[in-house]
């Protein structure tokens, strides 16, 4: 009977996940965007940024670059799709997609998906994490939170 309790305990312990928090920020330059505006007020904007800095709950930190688009309509609803590449202080890399649809260009929430990785980030491939992003003037703040199996 004791063996059964031990097996049950370890099964539950192994199935538990821990929170992983990723925070990034940067400055957006108008030089980093291309814009097409339609007569009805719809906009299609392509952004590229090479100056993002980040840190995470594991004690890692680094830089990232992202390229993507924002499509808005006359109601200022936004459809956003970005692809990002980041590297930590040890040179380990990760690649993500960040997709959201929201009621505001100024911020909102979406899903970050890890699509490739080297080193410690290989184990994160396929993990989807909800994120939030907020803009103020030329500054951007971004956070995503994942559940990682230990």
Which residues does each predicted region cover?
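Sec-dependent N-terminal signal peptides
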Residues: 3-13
């Amino acid at each position: 009977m004791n063996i059964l309790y031990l097996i049950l305990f370890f099964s539950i312990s192994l199935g538990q996940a821990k929170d992983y928090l990723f925070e990034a920020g940067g400055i957006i330059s108008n030089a980093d965007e291309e814009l097409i505006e339609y007569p009805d007020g719809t906009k299609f904007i392509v952004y590229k940024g090479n100056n993002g800095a980040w840190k995470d709950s594991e004690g890692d930190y680094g830089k990232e670059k992202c390229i993507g688009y924002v499509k808005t309509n006359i109601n200022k609803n936004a459809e956003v799709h970005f692809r990002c590449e980041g590297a930590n202080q040890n040179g380990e890399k990760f690649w993500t997609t960040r997709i959201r649809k929201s009621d505001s260009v100024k911020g909102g929430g979406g899903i970050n998906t890890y699509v490739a990785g080297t080193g410690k980030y290989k184990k994160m491939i396929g993990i989807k994490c909800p994120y939030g992003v907020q803009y103020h003037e030329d500054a951007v703040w971004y956070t995503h939170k994942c559940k990682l199996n230990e």
